[in-house]
Amino acid sequence: IDDGSKDKTWELIENAHGVDFAHIKGLRFTKNYGNQKALIAGLEYALKKGVDCAVTIDADLQQDETKIEEFINKFNEGSEIVYGIRKDRKSDNFIKKITGYAFYKFMNLMGANIVPNHSEYRLMSRKALDTLAQYKERNLFLRGIFCDTGLKSDYVEFDVKKRVHGDSKFSFLSLFKLAAEGITSFSVRPLR
């Protein structure tokens, strides 16, 4: 998904599609609609294509793509959802470590029982994608929804690699917005 990027993301997708990776499909947004909406668009597309499962991974090359085989093995063993769990936060600066820890702690305090240190790096079966498709809300919090499905799940630990190019666009404000979306779309605790 090219979420309205200003770099060469779309050009790379087009080039990959035409050469050795004809199976690569790309979706392009005209502007940045945000991480969750981009992921949902990609998952809806995969579901329409009739996939058995889908894996989401960030394009910044920090998540270990060699672990996808382990995700698929766990899927073949019967897991409907396989979470990518960061082994540690060594690659994060102090502020990112603190905000990451606070994010998961706060979300769980608010009643969104999410798996600590899992990112958007995950495998979802067709059954999990069908479950997601039943949600008609516009602001979905995927980390909460998938943890709440009751479907059989497992996890794969991975090391976060150093960022090769550029800086993360996921700022403290982005993390705050994600937490707010998670609380307002997934937790009833603030209403009590």
Model-derived segments and their meaning:
Residues 168-169, 180-192:
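Membrane interfacial helix-start motif at the N-side
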Residues 8, 12-15, 41, 70:
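Alpha-helical transmission elements in cytosolic ATPase-linked domains
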Residues 16-20:
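Short, conserved SAM-binding/catalytic segment
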Residues 1-5, 27-28, 57:
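Short beta-strand/loop segment that forms part of the nucleotide-sugar
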Residues 2-11, 61-62:
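A conserved acidic beta->alpha catalytic loop
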Residues 1, 72, 78, 190-192:
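Short, intrinsically disordered, charge-balanced linker/junction segments flanking boundaries
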Residues 23-25, 152-154:
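Conserved beta-strand segments of alpha/beta enzyme cores
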Residues 24-48, 53, 65-145, 161-180:
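Acceptor/aglycone-binding surface of glycosyltransferases and processive sugar-polymer synthases
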